[in-house]
């Protein structure tokens, strides 16, 4: 009962914050095309979109950028919803993020992974769902990916994502050691304005199986492993960007092989207060189903 109440409270808090963000962005738009004083001082699209764990970045991997459009004397925030449809599964993901003075980022996301008919094949029941909460934090150490155009030094940030899965018994049955864990990462991001090109590299230290949906650690490995993640984005205009991502994955479970992830995406930001991202993602093997590919769609609102 307590857990259900906590989950409802968390969800309600997220809805309230999302509603506040929508109200603030609407108010900002009502004020005309000029940027309101004290908010949204960054260039369009330089705050990234929402990664599936809630951090600012690409869809699959966090970037060193601090989310939102707040500069070093401003606060920014985003709320997002993402849907990923593969052949045999789907993922619903929603969350909120606050960026403080272009230095610190705090985020929360809730992921719901629906096994559809595969759940029935596994004896769990059709539509069996894993729910995972992700609490994240990121700190910019040095560099400015946008403003330091006279230097090759990238913006570098460190971050963490604490993840808690609600299906403890199930993930342990498939071989995971635990249903909660923490990822740590370091990201380096550089925007080359004259070439309209953004590059990002992330090194993640993780024990997560399928980003934590299948728990943490396993019969093959139960120690932190360093996994590489990378993104490249090309700015077609001030409102449009295209790009691709790669995310290396660990392989901890003997009965559930795991493959690296890839995607190709297009992002559209008509204003600083809303962005839409569409991607085609290749997720490889997930439990007993190979070649999981599908569409990724995400909407983000904020300032």
Model-found features: residue ranges?
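Short glycine/proline-enriched turn or capping motifs at secondary-structure junctions
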Residues: 286-296
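Cleavable N-terminal export/targeting peptides
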Residues: 1-46
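A mid-sequence, solvent-exposed acidic-amphipathic segment
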Residues: 199-247
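A generic signature of intrinsically disordered, low-complexity regions enriched in glycine/proline
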Residues: 6, 11, 249-250, 264
């Amino acid at each position: 009962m307590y857990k259900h109440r906590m989950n409802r409270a968390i969800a309600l808090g997220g809805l309230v914050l999302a509603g506040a963000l929508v109200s603030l962005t609407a108010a900002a738009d009502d004020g005309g095309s000029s940027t309101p004083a004290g908010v949204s001082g960054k260039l369009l699209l330089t705050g990234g979109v929402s990664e599936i764990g809630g951090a600012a970045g690409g869809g699959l991997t966090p970037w060193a950028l601090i989310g939102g459009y707040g500069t070093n004397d401003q606060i920014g925030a985003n709320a997002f919803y993402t849907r990923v449809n593969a052949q045999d599964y789907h993922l619903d993901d929603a969350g909120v993020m606050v960026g403080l003075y272009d230095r610190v980022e705090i985020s929360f996301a809730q992921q719901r992974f629906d096994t559809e008919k595969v759940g029935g094949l596994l004896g769990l029941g059709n539509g069996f769902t894993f729910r995972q909460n992700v609490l994240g934090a990121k700190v910019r150490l040095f560099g400015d990916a946008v403003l330091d155009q006279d230097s090759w030094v990238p913006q570098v940030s460190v971050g963490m994502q604490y993840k808690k899965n609600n299906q403890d018994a199930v993930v342990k049955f498939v071989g995971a050691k635990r249903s909660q864990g923490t990822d740590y990462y370091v990201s380096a991001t550089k925007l080359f304005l004259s070439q309209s090109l953004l590059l990002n590299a992330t090194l993640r230290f993780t024990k997560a199986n399928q980003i934590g949906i299948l728990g943490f650690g396993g019969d093959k490995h139960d120690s932190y492993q360093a996994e590489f993640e990378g993104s490249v984005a090309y700015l077609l205009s001030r409102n449009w960007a295209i790009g691709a991502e790669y995310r290396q994955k660990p392989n901890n479970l003997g009965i559930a092989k795991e493959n690296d992830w890839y995607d190709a995406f297009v992002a559209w930001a008509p204003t600083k207060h809303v962005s839409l991202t569409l991607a085609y993602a290749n997720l490889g093997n997930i439990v007993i189903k190979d070649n999981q590919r599908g569409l990724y769609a995400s909407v983000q609102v904020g300032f």
